[in-house]
Regions:
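Bacterial Sec-dependent N-terminal signal peptides
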Residues: 1-19
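Residue-level detector of conserved, function-critical positions
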Residues: 18-367
Length: 367
């Protein structure tokens, strides 16, 4: 059977509000809908995915914006363009970068050493090598004061000052002061951190060390995460208590109450009590998606369901090479996975059927 290269779509990171995916056919770019039909016929040399209802496309030498019907909303007049978010977009014209609104009008914002795209209602602003936040009205929400601010996740972002890390919310308020050598994602009021030589959790603003632990991974979608002690990995809850004692060589996060673990040179899946639901039999295994499928590898890759049944046979190659796939979750989302077959791209559903029975020269994520 021919191998298909899966570029796996994230469990929960992307919105499908437009239900359109960028595709390339006969050297031109268009957009595919979730029924497998070309909603916008391939006509562009370069283009970006839809965001905030608009997509940046290049018409000969200039960039402009179209809507989901392919109608020009902002004429092509820019030398470069990013994605709209919160009603604003970073563009470049005559070697100058600035924000525009959905009418194509320039928007006044405070001076910044670099223009950052908006995300979740805020954008970074950098002055005198310090980073702060602005809102879509161009108002400074947080005066530039940090050496670094990481992208927001779930309304919170990691911040760094003087080699110490903390966490802020979208208003710029520090929910965890920058006091720690390392810090994790903020999950339901809890995060992991390193204080001196100790690893532990910050609960209610107080650091609680977990004895013997030398690494903790970020929380995912369930109220637990995995941690390492004495060279073995187990799982802790949001209070820092072990729910599964350290006994695995490798592990990944829980989703659908199952987590991939590595023992005896094979991967299987355990439930939240530590009992195997899928016995260790695979050369590799990834986290379940919200669609209830997980990639597993024998010689090649396939997908199993939460009962361990092989839904898509292990006849495929998979890849997570994209740098923006910054999540533990890999697999299907909303019933679709982007795939590659004999140099052509398309989309499979959870039964392994090709969406619209069409292959393309390139295809990007639905958004």
């Amino acid at each position: 059977m021919k191998k298909i290269l899966f570029f796996l779509i994230l469990c929960s990171q992307f919105s499908f509000s437009q239900e359109l995916a960028l595709v390339k056919q006969n050297g031109k770019i268009g957009y595919l809908d979730k029924t497998g039909k070309l909603a916008i016929k391939p006509a562009y040399d370069k283009a970006r995915g839809f965001s905030d209802g608009l997509a940046a496309v290049k018409d000969q030498t200039k960039w402009g914006f179209i809507d989901a019907k392919g109608k020009w909303v902002i004429p092509a007049s820019f030398d470069d363009a990013e994605d709209f978010n919160s009603g604003l977009c970073v563009v470049e014209k005559d070697k100058k970068r600035f924000y525009i609104n959905k009418k194509g009008e320039a928007v006044n914002t405070p001076p910044t050493e670099k223009y950052f795209s908006f995300e979740n209602g805020v954008a970074f602003i950098r002055q005198a090598k310090k980073v702060g936040l602005i809102n879509p009205k161009g108002e400074i929400v947080l005066q530039p004061k940090y050496d670094m601010i990481k992208p927001f996740e779930g309304g919170y972002a990691r911040v760094k000052n003087n080699d110490r890390w903390g966490i802020i919310d979208k208003t710029g308020k520090a929910v965890v002061e920058p006091l720690y050598e390392e810090i994790g994602n903020y999950f339901k009021g809890v995060t992991w951190a390193k204080s001196g030589d100790a690893f532990g959790l910050i609960i209610g603003g107080k650091f609680k060390a977990i004895e013997g632990v030398d690494k903790i991974w970020d929380f995912h979608v369930q109220d637990n995460t995995y941690a390492r002690k004495g060279g073995k990995i187990g799982f802790i809850d949001t209070k820092g208590s072990w729910i599964i004692e350290p006994k695995f060589d490798k592990a990944r996060a829980f989703c659908k109450n199952l987590a991939p673990v590595y023992v005896g040179k094979k991967w299987g899946y355990v439930n939240t009590t530590g009992a195997f639901v899928v016995e260790p039999a695979y050369n590799d295994a990834e986290i379940f998606s919200e669609d209830g499928l997980a990639p597993v590898k024998e010689k090649d890759w396939g997908f199993i369901d939460v009962k361990g049944k092989m839904v898509i046979p292990t006849n495929y190659d998979i890849s997570t090479a994209f740098s923006f796939l910054n999540s533990d979750a890999k697999g299907f989302i909303s019933g679709v996975s982007r795939v590659k077959n004999n140099g052509k791209w398309g989309f499979l559903d959870t039964k392994g059927q090709l969406l619209g029975n069409q292959w393309f020269e390139n295809a990007e994520l639905f958004n």
